[in-house]
């Protein structure tokens, strides 16, 4: 594998950098979460990353050596928990993972969509800066295994491939695109949220 990390040190030390203007990201222990009614314990180990939405800033950790070269294929996997009280007062689409090239330039992403009228949450994958179609509903209050395949294509030919899996089931496949450059960074967290997405949390 290229990169593997956990949060069992209770911080971001296994990642290259953190962005958290507004201080909405932390690394709670199972003891902290156990005191919250309805909260999950960490998916694995004693700590996890938590983001409490409420502003438009990025709240992320970054691995700067992802290094998916032209024509190469790489997989990623992370666990995701969306609290039952996660809610918004306006419809919102925001990224929870980005594949970035030097710049940084967002080449592909995994996005969540929340609909204000129902607070239903959907997940999707796309070439480019934000998912606009192909969403699949994802349940709140339980852990999900999120997996994705990325085949990088920089040269002419539009041979790029993205696949998204939720709990082992493929929910989306995107083909026929090019990246501007090879992938260098992987960014996990929340990016481009609206301030109206302001209730609940993600783990």
Give a label for each model feature.
Residues 123-145, 154:
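Short, aromatic/His-centered strand-loop micro-motif at the edge of beta-sheets
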Residues 11-51:
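Extracellular glycan-recognition surfaces and repeat-rich motifs
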Residues 48-77, 128-133:
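Secreted extracellular polysaccharide-interacting domains
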Residues 78, 145-176:
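Carbohydrate-binding surfaces in secreted/extracellular proteins
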Residues 92-124, 134:
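Glycan-recognition/cleft segments
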Residues 174-202:
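Flexible glycan-contacting loops in extracellular carbohydrate-active proteins
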Residues 86-98, 157-161:
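Beta-strand acidic-aromatic groove motif in beta-rich domains, primarily in extracellular
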Residues 9, 67-73, 79-87, 99, ...:
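Solvent-exposed strand-to-loop "edge" motifs in beta-rich extracellular domains
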């Amino acid at each position: 594998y290229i990169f593997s990390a956990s949060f069992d040190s209770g911080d971001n030390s296994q990642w290259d950098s953190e962005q958290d203007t507004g201080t909405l990201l932390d690394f709670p222990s199972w003891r902290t979460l156990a005191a919250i009614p309805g909260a999950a314990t960490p998916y694995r180990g004693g700590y996890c990353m938590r983001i409490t939405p409420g502003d438009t800033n990025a709240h992320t950790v970054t691995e700067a050596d992802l290094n998916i070269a032209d024509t190469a294929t790489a997989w990623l996997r992370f666990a995701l928990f969306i609290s039952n009280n996660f809610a918004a007062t306006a419809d919102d689409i925001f990224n929870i993972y980005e594949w970035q090239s030097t710049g940084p330039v967002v080449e592909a992403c995994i996005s969540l969509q929340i609909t204000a009228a129902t607070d239903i949450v959907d997940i999707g994958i796309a070439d480019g800066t934000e998912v606009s179609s192909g969403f699949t509903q994802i349940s709140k209050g339980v852990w999900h295994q999120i997996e994705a395949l990325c085949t990088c294509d920089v040269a002419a030919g539009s041979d790029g491939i993205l696949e998204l899996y939720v709990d082992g089931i493929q929910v989306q496949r995107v083909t026929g695109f090019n990246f501007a450059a090879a992938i260098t960074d992987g960014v996990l967290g929340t990016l481009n949220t609206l301030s109206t997405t302001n209730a609940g949390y993600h783990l």
